[in-house]
Amino acid sequence: MATLTIDEIVDAISGMTVLEVAELVKKLEEKFGVSAAAMVAASPAAGGAAASPAAEEKTEFDVILQDAGANKLNVIKVVRELTGLGLKEAKDLVDGAPKPIKQGVSKEEAENIKKKLEEAGAKVEVK
């Protein structure tokens, strides 16, 4: 079996779509019997009081599709436009709501994305 370096693995992951990375995380969780959510939840406890000021100065936001609403086709079109995903990937993302559409974006970009998705009939949350 070929041995991959950490840099090769990072390069491979950086070329993946959001859906592919989410699938990778899910498979790693299953294989190793762990949960990525548990790790994230444990991190703020270690930070204690230092985590509070950081929350006030948040500069990166995640746009979460909560529900596609009644006009799912228009929502899929907007998701494709915003993410560059193919039709099947965009449909899977919309069908799997709640799911992140974009992560680590500026507040202005997050609000623009939210506006476009809500105009298409979706329910969206910015975190």
Curated annotation (Swiss-Prot):
Key words, A-Z: Ribonucleoprotein, Ribosomal protein
GO MF annotation list: mRNA binding; structural constituent of ribosome
Listed NCBIfam families: L12
Subunit structure: Homodimer. Part of the ribosomal stalk of the 50S ribosomal subunit. Forms a multimeric L10(L12)X complex, where L10 forms an elongated spine to which 2 to 4 L12 dimers bind in a sequential fashion. Binds GTP-bound translation factors.
Physiological role: Forms part of the ribosomal stalk which helps the ribosome interact with GTP-bound translation factors. Is thus essential for accurate translation.
Protein name as catalogued: Large ribosomal subunit protein bL12
Entry-linked CDD domains: Ribosomal_L7_L12
Any single biological process term in GO: translation
InterPro entries per record: Ribosomal_bL12, Ribosomal_bL12_C, Ribosomal_bL12_C/ClpS-like, Ribosomal_bL12_oligo, Ribosomal_bL12_oligo_N_sf
Organism listed in the record: Hydrogenobaculum sp. (strain Y04AAS1)
The keyword Ribosomal protein is assigned to this record: yes
Upper taxonomic lineage: Bacteria, Pseudomonadati, Aquificota, Aquificia, Aquificales
GO CC list: cytosolic large ribosomal subunit
Family named by the database record: Belongs to the bacterial ribosomal protein bL12 family.
Keyword Ribosomal protein attributed: yes
Gene: rplL
